[in-house]
């Protein structure tokens, strides 16, 4: 199987899906690897580093000739022309956010594996480290855009407690998963007050125990509680994600209108469509806009802004699955690995992820029934 590591085209995306160490593991197992020129530069990996581990450096077009194309994010529109039947495309594809790319993949017969839907022991194994990074960075961005020079309220999130008592900011975090707790931990480190809105009762108890000694309030998620708590936010971070599916717009325009003027609103799951009615995707170089008097931050690839850290985490999670596909062939790997099978979103024209199929009103079939 010919494996290609391609350079990301998404604006501001510095990550690469495979490190030189991963290439060494693949070539040592007898697999041929090609790497697009400068694919790893943003993460600190030179072309020479890949070549030393057995990869061949190729052009963008040549990379897309591979049987297995390893990416970080979804293909750019300019790359749709390279799709071919039975080609495996691997990455955080977030296909629920775009019916166009789904139709392109379906029409050609591409096999799409989305890392965010690989679920092992009930957890999104590959997505978790990226969620942690996005959560931490969101808390930092909330502090940054609270400054007056960026259109914020002009507040210092830490407050001031030297001979005076000026309170810090209030972070309201929607959702209680990995991204949420990482955002909360950074906010607490900045001396902010944190309110977490969570639906699951067991998770609420877990969060209450985790933060028993901290300035954290955990609130049951209901539309009424969300509407009440969002008014308190200096920084509001939505972390709600339904793996493979497009989430509902739970934060309405009316709720956004009720927020403090100059407060900051961040949607970590904007790459899947987001849960905020007024949010739209932005870029790392142009990350914010103002609507209803609130600063909106909608960057869909936040880990791409810290590629040296996030690439190492991403590649460490990827490699065992990629090796299994290459060693066994995709169909056998799917049969042997339940977590991997959950990652297959499209197989030779058929939607095999129920959340994706529901999001675009398409026919769904279970992957094991398709490959039999």
Curated annotation (Swiss-Prot):
UniProt name for this protein: Alanine dehydrogenase 1
Pfam family, one: AlaDh_PNT_N
Active site positions: 94
Keyword Zinc-finger: no
Signal peptide: none
Top EC group: oxidoreductase
Alphabetized Gene3D superfamilies for the sequence: NAD(P)-binding Rossmann-like Domain
InterPro entries: Ala_DH, Ala_DH/PNT_CS2, AlaDH/PNT_N, AlaDH/PNT_NAD(H)-bd, NAD(P)-bd_dom_sf
SMART domains assigned: AlaDh_PNT_C, AlaDh_PNT_N
Reaction(s) this enzyme catalyzes, per UniProt: L-alanine + NAD(+) + H2O = pyruvate + NH4(+) + NADH + H(+)
EC number(s) given by UniProt: 1.4.1.1
Family, similarity comment: Belongs to the AlaDH/PNT family.
Stated role: May play a role in cell wall synthesis as L-alanine is an important constituent of the peptidoglycan layer.
GO terms for cellular component: plasma membrane
GO biological process terms held by the UniProt record: L-alanine catabolic process
Pathway of action: Amino-acid degradation; L-alanine degradation via dehydrogenase pathway; NH(3) and pyruvate from L-alanine: step 1/1
GO molecular function, one term: alanine dehydrogenase activity
Record keywords: NAD, Oxidoreductase
Entry binding sites for NAD(+): 170-200
């Amino acid at each position: 199987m010919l494996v290609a590591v391609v350079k990301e085209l998404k604006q501001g995306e510095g990550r690469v899906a495979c490190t030189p160490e991963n290439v060494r593991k693949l070539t040592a197992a007898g697999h041929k690897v090609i790497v697009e020129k400068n694919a790893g530069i943003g993460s600190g990996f030179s072309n020479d580093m890949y070549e030393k581990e057995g990869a061949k450096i190729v052009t963008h077009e040549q990379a897309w000739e591979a049987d297995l194309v390893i990416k970080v994010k979804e293909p750019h529109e300019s790359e749709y022309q390279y799709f071919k039947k039975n080609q495996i495309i691997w990455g955080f594809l977030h296909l629920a956010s775009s019916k166009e790319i789904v139709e392109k993949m379906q029409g050609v017969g591409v096999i799409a594996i989305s890392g965010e839907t690989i679920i092992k022991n009930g957890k999104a194994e590959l997505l978790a480290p990226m969620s942690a990074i996005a959560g931490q960075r969101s808390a930092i961005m909330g502090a940054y855009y609270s400054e007056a020079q960026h259109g914020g309220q002009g507040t210092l999130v830490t407050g001031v407690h030297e001979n005076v008592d000026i309170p810090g900011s209030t972070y309201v975090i929607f959702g209680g998963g990995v991204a949420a707790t990482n955002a909360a931990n950074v906010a607490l480190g900045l001396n902010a007050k944190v309110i977490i809105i969570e639906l699951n009762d067991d998770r609420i108890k877990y969060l209450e125990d985790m933060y028993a000694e901290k300035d954290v309030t955990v609130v049951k998620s209901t539309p009424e509680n969300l509407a009440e708590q969002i008014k308190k936010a200096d920084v509001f971070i939505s972390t709600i994600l339904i793996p493979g599916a497009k989430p509902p717009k739970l934060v309405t325009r009316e709720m956004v209108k009720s927020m403090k003027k100059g407060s900051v609103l961040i949607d970590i799951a904007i790459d899947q469509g987001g849960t905020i009615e007024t949010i739209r995707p932005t870029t790392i170089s142009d990350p914010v806009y103002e609507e209803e008097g609130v600063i909106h931050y909608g960057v869909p690839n936040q880990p791409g802004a810290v590629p040296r850290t996030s690439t190492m985490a991403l590649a460490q999670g990827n490699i065992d699955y990629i090796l299994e596909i290459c060693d066994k062939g995709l169909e056998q790997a799917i049969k042997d690995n339940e977590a991997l099978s959950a990652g297959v979103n499209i197989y030779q024209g058929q939607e095999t992820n129920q959340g994706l199929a529901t999001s675009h009103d398409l026919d769904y079939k279970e992957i094991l029934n398709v490959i039999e």
